[in-house]
């Protein structure tokens, strides 16, 4: 085996190791739950994220308003709670709150 064949073999092994390590990435889910999404879509938007790890800070990767986006999560509801009745949760994005299908408000509900 010549030195060039050995070099090609070593580079190939290094690439296979890197690709295998990338595929084993652990997907750690961030705390909180995705906001309720009552929007009906004709066509989905291209995803802005695939996992929570794609999102900065506390944001989670959630399907919201016709596509996967990084959004501020809502706190988990206490046992027996109803997500649709929980008006104390933060807005999915600053200044916006999803209302019943297709209607938006520019402010969050107050307690």
From Swiss-Prot:
Top-level taxon in the UniProt lineage: Eukaryota
Chief site of localization: secreted
Signal peptide as annotated in the record: 1-23
Alphabetical list of InterPro entries matching this protein: Elafin-like_sf, WAP_dom
GO molecular function: serine-type endopeptidase inhibitor activity
Pfam (any one): WAP
Domain (WAP): residue spans on this chain: 27-74
Record keywords, A-Z: Antibiotic, Antimicrobial, Disulfide bond, Protease inhibitor, Secreted, Serine protease inhibitor, Signal
GO annotation terms (biological process): defense response to bacterium
Annotated disulfide bonds: 34-62, 41-66, 49-61, 55-70
Gene3D superfamilies per record: Elafin-like
GO cellular component terms, A-Z: extracellular region
Keyword Transmembrane helix listed: no
Location of region: Disordered: 80-111
Annotated localization: Secreted
Its biological purpose: Antibacterial protein. Putative acid-stable proteinase inhibitor.
Protein name listed in UniProt: WAP four-disulfide core domain protein 12
Lineage of source species: Eukaryota, Metazoa, Chordata, Craniata, Vertebrata
